[in-house]
């Protein structure tokens, strides 16, 4: 299993604990476990860095697994429990089949979900996007791109993840009663080669496809590549999710119409800060419905330059 343990203490580049040194082992550890390797989680890591600076008494880690499966996440969680971590925030890959494992974690550590929820588990709260609402936003962007309707295809890593199911739901709700036709939703298990193949196949099978939409961060750049390679840039519209650099470039050059961006920086920061509050006996931050919603934003040609500049400053690129 490919596994990357990313330190989130600014200036530390070696893999390992976020806070190294003679007394690192005396500090409680907090970890954010991702569901894939993507720029999205690099941004979340910057939020963890802020929390680390504010709370040097903790070790705060970003754990990126290259095996983006429920089984891979279970192994990560088991390893963290063996290491005795105090708190975990996780983007859940397969909520229906993860509940038992998550409840085991919740019995031993503070558990928060972020990005993709597991509402049936004993997690303290979910921190992230209202994904149904984000799906509706994407649906509105699709309608803008296709005022006369047309065929569309959706692409996502897996429909086992709550955020994927909810985004599809929101898109369908927004498009109900229009002339936009969803031909299918394609999954790739976060296998970039399979994702690319899915997109290429759609372009061949549906020569009249009007729009393609990637629901996870890595898919929109792959759609961008596939459409350009097929010579259909500008003909096949693209609406995506998240702020991958290639997605933003595609918006700038007019190949991509828009993208729905979340606030992964806040996902990281709020996860760490609120785990620490909970460890200290403070749960006043938990909303009544157990969901701390972070707003989304539409990025298109009108605001992409400003957004890209802010993102560059955040990432130090």
Language-model segment annotations:
Residues 1-8:
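Bacterial N-terminal signal peptides that target proteins for export
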Residues 8-16:
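Bacterial N-terminal signal peptides
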Residues 3, 13, 22-317:
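A residue-level marker of the well-folded mature domains of exported/periplasmic proteins
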